[in-house]
């Protein structure tokens, strides 16, 4: 039986509330689960203690039994200091693409050329007056 520690959605429309559960991976997301391990309320502020509550002893028990945490649960465990932080695969996601870099370079070149042109004009007028 492939076990997962994952989120099961509850709450009403536009007001999500999640249970952290240990369940068989073949069961539906909000369906049958084996044990409730905690709760997650995304509507609370990030620094609130009630945002994520987990029974760490039971979570460790299920991890020892071979249950695989989902990505979000593994992030919760990392934030709690229960597991070491892993490298993420999308390190370049925040960097701009090639065309955006080219446009930024062109814009910078035009701005520097425009800044140099007015600076040269008064210098040329001063030289012409002498």
UniProtKB/Swiss-Prot annotation:
Keyword Ribonucleoprotein appears in the UniProt entry? yes
| Stretches with biased composition (Low complexity) | 110-130
Q: Where is the composition biased (Basic and acidic residues)?
A: 99-109
| Any one Gene Ontology molecular-function term assigned to this protein's record | structural constituent of ribosome
GO:BP terms for this protein?
translation
Please tell me whether the keyword Transmembrane is annotated for this protein.
no
Give positions of region: Disordered.
80-130
Provide the alphabetized UniProt keywords. Answer: Ribonucleoprotein, Ribosomal protein
- UniProt GO cellular component terms: cytoplasm; small ribosomal subunit
What SUPFAM superfamilies does the annotation carry?
Ribosomal protein S16
What family name appears in the similarity comment?
A: Belongs to the bacterial ribosomal protein bS16 family.
- What's the protein here called? Small ribosomal subunit protein bS16
């Amino acid at each position: 039986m492939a076990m997962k520690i994952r989120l099961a959605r509850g709450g009403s429309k536009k007001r999500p509330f999640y249970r952290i559960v240990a369940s068989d991976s073949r069961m539906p997301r909000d369906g049958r689960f084996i044990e409730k391990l905690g709760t997650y309320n995304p509507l609370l502020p990030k620094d609130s203690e009630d945002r994520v509550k987990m029974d760490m002893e039971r979570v460790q028990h299920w991890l020892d039994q071979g249950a695989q945490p989902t990505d979000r649960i593994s992030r919760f465990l990392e934030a709690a200091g229960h597991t070491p932080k892993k490298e993420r695969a999308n390190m370049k996601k925040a960097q701009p693409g090639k065309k955006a870099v080219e446009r930024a370079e062109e814009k910078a070149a035009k701005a520097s050329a425009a800044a140099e042109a007015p600076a040269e004009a008064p210098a040329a007028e001063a030289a012409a007056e002498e």
